[in-house]
């Protein structure tokens, strides 16, 4: 039978929600009955010794696994008669489960069968029911079913708040699921009943260490981000003061083009700016990276080295041999990102392509009123005259 069939067609998430709501409702009923009992006592009447609401919890309605095919404990099983009390029957099932559990992982399913049988008796000894649940949780802990461990132990400690094994197993399962705060809370609850419990103290220490490690990593990340922002603000200020260069936020991850994620615009001791520049060839999804495009360098200076006119060297992707100096055009898009310095006023215009002449130096382009450096300068390289070129300029790509 599938999981959905066994749970009435519910998904795992829906089943978890149903379970959580049922436990909450049951706890509320317990509190209401406790209050009612106190009122009975105050009136000199006899309080209700126990309730049966817990018997309707989904945890007691799970489908049993198949009965063991070869049962070496059959004699003990057959000794159960109608004369036995529910508590005696449940204890016999539990003992059979314990025997199978001790035989190891190959018999875990058999052990589960008998722990489920013990629970299905629904005896009125809540201390015993607490043990059956925590025993079943022990098997699921070994099987890695941590969610089931938490469910069983949550009810187990409600049945018997002094069941230290249930606290321990629940805290370990929460630790395995990286629910460190929940694990600490579970340990604290158990330790409130038994302050000297070493197992719970150890689990709590481990959970707290994990939690502190996470907090430290998060704080380190925040500190690093703040430091980076301060560095960007300082660089943006210096660039703008230098020549109205407007440093902006990146428009996409540049590390795929620069091969170094920390590549950025720099200013040397002579106050000269060095631009790492990316040339994008949108027709083919290719790129070139220029590590140091100095302020007085023209675009032609670099393009002629990449596409020498006297001895053309065509890129492997340029099968039609269309990317030559006489056809290559360079473009940037206006206002494609926002400047880091919030006090810089940018003229709001519709985005458009601006062509850059080969003879223009990069300083003039970068200082253009509508050019904002997207972390590092980017320029688009296209070949004039073909179909892609027309679509590119029309923004129909």
UniProtKB/Swiss-Prot annotation:
PROSITE patterns documented for this protein: TPR_REGION
Output the GO biological process annotations, alphabetical, semicolon-separated.
protein folding
Q: Does the keyword Protease apply?
A: no
- Claim: Repeat is one of the keywords in the record: yes
Q: Which domain of life is it from?
A: Eukaryota
Which residue ranges contain the repeat TPR?
Answer: 90-125, 130-163, 164-197
Single GO molecular-function term?
Hsp90 protein binding
**What InterPro entries does this protein's entry cite?**
Csn1/TTC4_wheel (IPR044059), TPR-like_helical_dom_sf (IPR011990), TPR_rpt (IPR019734)
Q: Which UniProt keywords apply?
A: Repeat, TPR repeat
Gene Ontology CC terms: nucleus
Which family does the record claim for this protein? Answer: Belongs to the TTC4 family.
Q: What is this protein called in UniProt?
A: Tetratricopeptide repeat protein 4 homolog
Species:
Dictyostelium discoideum
Task: Give the classification, highest ranks.
Answer: Eukaryota, Amoebozoa, Evosea, Eumycetozoa, Dictyostelia
Gene expressing this chain: ttc4
């Amino acid at each position: 039978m599938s999981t959905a069939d066994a749970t009435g067609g519910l998904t795992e998430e829906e089943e978890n929600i149903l379970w959580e709501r049922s436990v909450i409702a049951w706890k509320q009923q317990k509190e209401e009955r406790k209050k009612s009992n106190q009122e009975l006592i105050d009136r000199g009447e006899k309080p209700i010794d126990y309730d049966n609401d817990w018997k309707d919890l989904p945890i007691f309605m799970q489908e049993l696994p198949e009965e063991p095919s070869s049962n070496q404990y059959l004699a003990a099983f057959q000794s159960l008669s109608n004369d036995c009390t529910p508590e005696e029957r449940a204890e016999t099932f539990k003992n059979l489960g314990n025997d199978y559990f001790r035989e190891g992982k190959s018999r875990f399913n058999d052990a589960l069968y008998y722990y489920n049988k013990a629970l299905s008796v629904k005896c009125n000894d809540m201390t015993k029911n607490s043990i059956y649940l925590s025993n079943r949780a022990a098997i699921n802990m070994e099987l890695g079913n941590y969610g089931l461990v938490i469910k069983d132990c949550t009810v187990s400690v409600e049945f018997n708040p002094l069941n230290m094994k249930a606290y321990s197993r629940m805290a370990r399962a929460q630790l395995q699921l990286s629910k460190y705060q929940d694990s600490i809370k579970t340990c604290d609850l158990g330790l409130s009943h038994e302050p000297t419990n070493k197992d719970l103290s150890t689990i709590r220490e481990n959970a707290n260490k994990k939690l502190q490690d996470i907090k430290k990593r998060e704080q380190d990340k925040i500190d690093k981000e703040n430091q980076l922002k301060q560095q960007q603000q300082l660089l943006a200020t210096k660039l703008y003061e230098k020549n109205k260069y407007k440093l902006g936020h990146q428009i996409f991850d540049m590390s795929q083009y620069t091969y170094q994620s920390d590549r950025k615009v720099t200013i040397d001791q002579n106050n000269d700016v060095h631009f790492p520049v990316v040339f994008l060839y949108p027709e083919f999804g290719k790129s070139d990276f220029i590590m140091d495009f100095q302020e007085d360098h023209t675009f032609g200076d670099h393009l002629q080295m990449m596409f020498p006119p006297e001895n053309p060297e065509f890129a492997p992707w340029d099968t039609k041999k269309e990317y030559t100096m006489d056809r290559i055009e360079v473009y940037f898009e206006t206002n494609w990102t926002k400047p880091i310095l919030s006090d810089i006023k940018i003229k709001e215009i519709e985005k458009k392509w601006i062509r850059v002449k080969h003879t223009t130096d990069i300083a003039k382009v970068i200082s253009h009123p509508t050019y904002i450096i997207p972390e590092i300068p980017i320029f688009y390289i296209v070949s004039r005259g073909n179909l892609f070129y027309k679509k590119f300029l029309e923004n129909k790509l």
